[in-house]
């Protein structure tokens, strides 16, 4: 093989893998695997446009990890599927005038072709397609199991409604008041919806964060989204009525600074407390607030609006009367839907009070002397209580305890823990999704469909465009809607909402090893063998939706005896994002990179290698058109080296370089620092070929094995050329470094400060200037002189001297 033809090599080995079933598991293979390792990556939504280079980046990085684990001797199960239901597919089908039942199969076929072409080791024997009745039958089963567990509830609630998509959209899908799918302004509606009670698991989900090996930014996002708050429920008696307004606050220490109350527009007391003089104004304001989406109402920088409802309540500590207002900056979903407004110490309350000329009172000061004067902004720092009567001089923490104790003694407060997390609304008034398996009966109410009657098939509708009724298009298929009640046999009507696509993806990983059976959703033996998932790689953007929902479903199934583990993914890593020539890649910028063209020109291995060379996998990198030539040249030189290889043994210097490379590559690949892995392999090849020397097979075999996760086709070809008959991935061939040979030579160099020798440090040939300075600062004698002034200049000659100029 004097020349390297990617097209020929890749076609040959993809065909060979298919013929031999190299990447496939039979049911027996799954059952008998000795070292099972489940390597999962997020399954894609199969768009009509196909995969773009960002997708290829993500899937290649995950495949590199899976192939590495296989070379370490694991039986790596790496399935792939398609998240094909949902509003994206439906909207595109409406746009092009094609039924989604016809559109999705061709999209999946194209995605499969692209995924095969990049050479990933997917097990195509175990795929899932969320639109397949054999899959969504079990999604409906998941719903029923959660229903049996008391974790499903139908209730009326304010929701974000997109008038263009004509369906409910989650808070997370509203960006700056616009629907993320179509950019239409979102409004608020009160609609009966099906909810999954994820809030029952809020604390469990928080506690579990401590025990899973996930990307820190993903765990932080989940922690913030769940949003645990410790505080108190406090009752404010309503003047002239024998009832109270209950508020939840995390700052009971500031109660003496509460100068007015605010109710959310949806709060039932708004209507009950509004007097006749204010009713017309209040009702108009409430209607206006309903037209706003829930997420936009949370923006801190929104102008504050509201109106007094004509009522007062009493501050339970000071006895002062406080006017009761209604404003859209208070949300019914958080706390009790009512707040005690403390404008002196809350920025939103301060802005509201300033807008409507309401009193602002300081009750927290940095020290006891700083308790007077006009407040020009809210003070949100720590300090001592002031202007708080008997509580003056207490710290914030002491004030919280003392005030709650006094209120509790008078039955006006109770300590509480609340969460930002809301229950998960799964109802969608669209066509393209799994029908929710519920039947309504006038006598029996909402009745779950018996498991034996699953799946509730989604009928083919030729007219599936949603309308303004708020009902799903399925409601127009009266024949489908009409059915018998499973309990009494009387007339029944099917639920016409379909479920959120995030329910499809909340459990798909559980199904992968069980696709060989249609009798049950989860094969107990297979689930015990292969789950929880060992490694999961995907996008950080799914931190608070898919990943949180998957954890919830898994915990619920564990609690009800379906699973014997409570966390679905032992390890999760969020991959980085690519840019192009320094600019974000997007359709609007016209700089989307199509992988098919790249692979046709350069070959899949070169594309894989280049993408992984762009930067640490968890950070991403910048795609440069000219950058791909370097990886291409490297593969060509390696192929040429194999063609010219001798049977002799390597010399001692090359042997040491080999083991240092094995050591570095093994360490860096564990940290997903794929770019430095590739750099190390390139450097090693330079050492092996230095001065035009002929490489030995012994010197080349380790580099080929370590390259195999990145360039699997060429690695297989070169392995065969070196005389091996089996696949490079069959026998756990990952090399181990000899600690003695991998030792890096160290030597002492002098450290001069302002031209005078002040000490020495121990370095290697690879020690960087920054590392050398760190070592110098750790030397007490040197550090004394470095700290005497400001470092103005550093002159570092690797292996010789470190010279520092200090002012």
Task: Report residues per predicted region.
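Basic, alpha-helical terminal appendages of large translation-related enzymes
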Residues: 1-20, 25-34, 264, 279, ...
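Helix-rich, typically C-terminal accessory recognition domains appended to large enzymatic cores
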Residues: 148-160, 164, 228, 415-444, ...
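Residue patterns forming the tRNA-binding/recognition surfaces of aminoacyl-tRNA synthetases
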Residues: 3, 12, 16-20, 95-253, ...
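Amphipathic alpha-helical
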Residues: 14, 199, 204-228, 264-307, ...
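Catalytic alpha/beta core of large soluble enzyme barrels
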Residues: 62-63, 75, 267-367, 372-373, ...
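N-terminal catalytic cores of NTP/NDP-binding nucleotidyl/phosphoryl-transfer enzymes
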Residues: 28-100, 104, 127-142, 249-250, ...
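Alpha-helical recognition segments enriched in aromatics with Gly/Pro capping
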Residues: 311-334, 482-619
């Amino acid at each position: 093989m004097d020349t390297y033809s990617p097209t020929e090599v890749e076609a040959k080995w993809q065909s060979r893998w298919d013929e031999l079933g190299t990447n496939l598991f039979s049911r027996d293979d799954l059952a008998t695997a000795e070292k099972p390792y489940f390597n999962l990556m997020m399954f894609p939504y199969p768009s009509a446009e196909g995969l773009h280079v960002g997708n290829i980046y993500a899937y290649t990085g995950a495949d590199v990890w899976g192939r590495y684990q296989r070379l370490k001797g694991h039986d790596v199960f790496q399935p792939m599927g398609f998240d094909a239901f949902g509003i994206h597919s439906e909207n595109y089908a409406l746009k092009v005038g094609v039924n989604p039942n016809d559109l999705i199969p061709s999209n999946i076929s194209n995605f499969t072709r692209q995924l095969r072409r990049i050479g990933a080791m997917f097990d195509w024997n175990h795929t899932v397609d969320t639109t397949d009745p054999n899959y969504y039958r079990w999604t409906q089963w998941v719903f029923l199991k959660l229903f049996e567990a008391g974790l499903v509830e139908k209730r009326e609630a304010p929701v974000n409604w997109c008038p263009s998509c004509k369906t409910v959209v989650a808070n997370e899908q509203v960006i700056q008041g616009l629907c993320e799918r179509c950019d239409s302004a979102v409004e608020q509606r009160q609609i009966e919806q099906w909810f999954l009670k994820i809030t029952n698991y809020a604390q469990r989900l928080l506690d579990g964060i401590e025990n899973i090996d996930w990307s820190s930014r993903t765990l932080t996002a989940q922690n913030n989204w769940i949003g645990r708050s410790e505080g108190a429920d406090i009752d404010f008696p309503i003047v002239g009525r024998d009832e109270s307004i209950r508020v939840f606050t995390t700052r009971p220490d500031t109660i003496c600074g509460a100068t007015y109350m605010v109710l959310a527009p949806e709060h039932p007391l708004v209507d009950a407390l509004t007097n006749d003089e204010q009713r017309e104004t209040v009702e108009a304001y409430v209607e206006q607030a309903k037209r706003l989406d829930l997420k936009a109402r949370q923006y801190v920088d929104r102008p504050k609006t509201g109106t007094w409802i004509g009522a007062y309540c009493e501050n339970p500590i000071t006895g002062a009367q406080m006017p009761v207002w209604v404003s859209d900056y208070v949300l019914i979903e958080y706390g009790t839907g009512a707040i005690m407004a403390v404008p002196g110490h809350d920025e939103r309350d301060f802005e509201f009070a300033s807008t409507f000329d309401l009193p602002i009172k300081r009750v927290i000061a940095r020290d006891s002397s700083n308790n007077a004067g006009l407040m020009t902004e809210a003070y949100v720092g720590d300090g001592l209580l002031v202007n708080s009567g008997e509580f003056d001089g207490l710290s914030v923490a002491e004030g919280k305890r003392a005030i709650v104790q006094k209120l509790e003694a008078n039955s006006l407060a109770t300590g509480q823990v609340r969460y930002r997390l809301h229950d998960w609304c799964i109802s969608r008034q669209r066509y393209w999704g799994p029908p929710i398996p519920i039947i309504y009966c006038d006598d029996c109410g909402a009745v779950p469909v018996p498991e034996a009657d699953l799946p509730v098939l989604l009928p083919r509708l030729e007219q599936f465009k949603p309308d303004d009724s708020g009902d799903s298009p399925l409601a127009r298929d009266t024949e489908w809607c009409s059915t018998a009640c499973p309990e009494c046999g009387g007339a029944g009507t099917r639920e016409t909402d379909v479920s959120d696509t995030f329910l499809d993806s909340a459990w798909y990983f559980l199904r992968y090893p069980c696709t060989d059976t249609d009798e049950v959703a989860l094969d107990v033996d297979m689930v015990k063998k292969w789950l929880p998932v060992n490694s999961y790689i995907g996008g950080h953007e799914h931190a608070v939706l898919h990943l949180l929902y998957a954890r919830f479903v898994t915990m619920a199934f564990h609690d009800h005896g379906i699973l014997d583990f409570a966390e679905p993914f032992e390890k999760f890593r969020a991959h980085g994002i690519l840019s192009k020539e320094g600019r974000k890649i997007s359709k609007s910028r016209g700089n989307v990179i199509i992988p098919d063209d790249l692979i046709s020109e350069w070959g899949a291995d070169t594309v894989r290698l280049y993408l992984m060379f762009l930067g640490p996998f968890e950070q991403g990198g910048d795609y440069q058109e000219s950058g791909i030539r370097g990886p291409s040249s490297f593969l060509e030189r390696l192929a040429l080296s194999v063609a010219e290889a001798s049977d002799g043994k390597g010399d001692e210097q090359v042997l040491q370089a080999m083991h240092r490379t094995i050591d570095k590559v093994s360490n860096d690949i564990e940290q997903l620092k794929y770019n430095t892995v590739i750099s190390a392999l390139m450097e090693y090849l330079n050492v092996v070929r230095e001065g035009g020397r002929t490489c030995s097979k012994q010197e080349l075999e380790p580099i080929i094995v370590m390259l195999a996760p990145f360039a699997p086709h060429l690695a297989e070809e070169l392995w065969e050329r070196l005389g091996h008959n089996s696949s490079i991935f069959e026998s756990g061939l990952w090399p181990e470094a000899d600690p003695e040979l991998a030792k890096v030579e160290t030597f002492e160099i002098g450290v001069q400060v302002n031209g005078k020798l002040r000490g020495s440090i121990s370095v290697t040939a690879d020690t960087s200037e920054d590392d050398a300075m760190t070592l110098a600062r750790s030397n007490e004698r040197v550090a004394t002189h470095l700290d005497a002034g400001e470092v103005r200049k550093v002159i570092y000659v690797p292996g010789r001297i470190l010279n520092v100029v200090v002012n």
